[in-house]
UniProtKB/Swiss-Prot annotation:
Its EC number is 3.6.5.3. Residues 136-139 are annotated as: G4. It is an enzyme of class 3 (hydrolase). Residues 174-176 are annotated as: G5. InterPro entries: EF-Tu_GTP-bd, EF-Tu_GTPase, EFTu-like_2, EFTU_2, G_TR_CS, P-loop_NTPase, Small_GTP-bd, T_Tr_GTP-bd_dom. GTP hydrolase that promotes the GTP-dependent binding of aminoacyl-tRNA to the A-site of ribosomes during protein biosynthesis. The gene is tuf1. It comes from Hahella chejuensis (strain KCTC 2396). This is Elongation factor Tu. It comes from the Bacteria.
Length: 397
């Protein structure tokens, strides 16, 4: 059979497997590629091809991740799977692999375990919007009541971390049976096919960057005689059109101005779109009113804040991080988008110190406001050297 060409027309959705070690995340990942390729076409990937995940560097942090893809009739899925627990922590905090939804794999034989809980918590902290559950190894459980008990435990756990536990879809099956092409009692290929159909139905199509409200981090500011002030940067999302009002947010008080021109490679354009590097000409704005680290945004869509709770991964010594722990009162720089802002760290109750290689929840108070929203990623730096990575989990003020 001739290979089908890759259909760009289908919407693209990013997913990933999460859950406790040895509950079957990688087996399920392999089974997903196998079942989809048989039912709907595409490439099947063997277990070994996923398990020996290549290491990649994201913001100087070494993460082992496997990427596979599969297709349903209506979507193209890009799926990430990590070999070790530490890789999940780094992956989710740095946002190296942003997930539109996660597949929580939980062994029906063991029930929820410590990493099951930790991955659900991380998903909540870093803003993974949807979780679908695959209750794996169900062929090893003869007792129907035991299955129901495990299902209830998983639902409780999801509810504890503000996911809709009662309404979360749970598919019961065996990834191994599916991988071997078996389907005893509908636990194998049927269950995995049902999982994909559930992903299609339960995870909404993600909004594309271009459809979101305009935002551009300011990288540079120029004054052009006779024309005014130009700010440059890469449009993060949305579209800015000539004649539209924009806000300058962060560091100082928020101000409003109008975009009077957009240029790219010295050519004048009507608009700047997500992903493009552009210069935006601002009406009546003085060179000193704007600085790197602020953002240009559609009015009313983003606000400046100084105090927030974050989930942080501290680089290990091998990753070029600190060689020693830090304690409460630690004051590093927090690098948001294009600039560093000093901030004080408050550690959770009962945590005296944080070691390199740890992940920790901490409250940060910045000395200057930054345009932020939940889910914004940042780096922690000391004198220009990255020592940590984090994500804004909750904004306080």
């Amino acid at each position: 059979m001739a290979k089908e060409k890759f259909e760009r027309s289908k919407p693209h959705v990013n997913v990933g497997t999460i859950g406790h070690v040895d509950h079957g995340k990688t087996t399920l990942t392999a089974a997903l590629t196998r079942v989809c390729s048989e039912v709907w076409g595409g490439q099947a990937v063997a277990f070994d091809g996923i398990d020996n995940a290549p290491e990649e560097k994201a913001r100087g942090i070494t993460i082992a991740t496997s990427h596979v893809e599969y297709e349903s009739p209506i979507r193209h899925y890009a799926h990430v799977d990590c070999p070790g627990h530490a890789d999940y922590v780094k992956n989710m905090i740095t946002g190296a692999a942003q997930m539109d939804g996660a597949i929580l794999v939980c062994s029906a034989a063991d029930g929820p375990m410590p990493q099951t809980r930790e991955h659900i918590l991380l998903a909540r902290q870093v803003g993974v919007p949807y979780i679908v559950v695959f209750l794996n190894k169900a062929d090893m459980v003869d007792d129907e009541e035991l299955l129901e008990l495990v299902e209830m435990e998983v639902r409780d756990l999801l509810s504890q971390y503000e996911f809709p536990g009662d309404d979360t879809p749970i598919i019961v099956g065996s990834a191994l049976l599916a991988l071997e092409g078996k389907d005893d009692n509908g636990m194998g290929t049927s269950a995995v096919k049902k999982l994909v159909e559930t992903l299609d139905a339960y995870i909404p199509e993600p909004e594309r960057a271009i459809d979101k409200p305009f935002l551009m981090p300011i990288e540079d500011v120029f004054s052009i005689s006779g024309r005014g002030t130009v700010v440059t940067g890469r449009v993060e999302r949305g579209i800015v059109r000539v004649g539209e009002e924009v806000e300058i947010v962060g560091i100082k008080d928020t101000t409003k101005t109008t975009c009077t021109g957009v240029e790219m490679f010295r050519k004048l354009l009507d608009e700047g779109r997500a992903g493009e590097n552009v210069g935006v000409l601002l009406r009546g704005t003085k060179r000193d009113d704007v600085e790197r680290g602020q953002v240009l945004a559609k009015p009313g869509t983003i606000t400046p804040h100084t105090v927030f709770e974050s989930e942080v991964y501290v680089l290990s010594k091998d990753e070029g991080g600190r060689h020693t722990p830090f304690f409460k009162g630690y004051r590093p720089q927090f690098y948001f988008r294009t600039t560093d802002v000093t901030g004080a760290c408050e550690l959770p109750e009962g945590v005296e110190m944080v070691m390199p290689g740890d992940n920790v929840k901490m409250k940060v108070s910045l000395i200057a406001p930054i345009a932020m929203e939940e889910g914004l990623r940042f780096a922690i730096r000391e004198g220009g050297r990255t020592v940590g990575a984090g994500v804004v989990a909750k904004i306080f003020e």
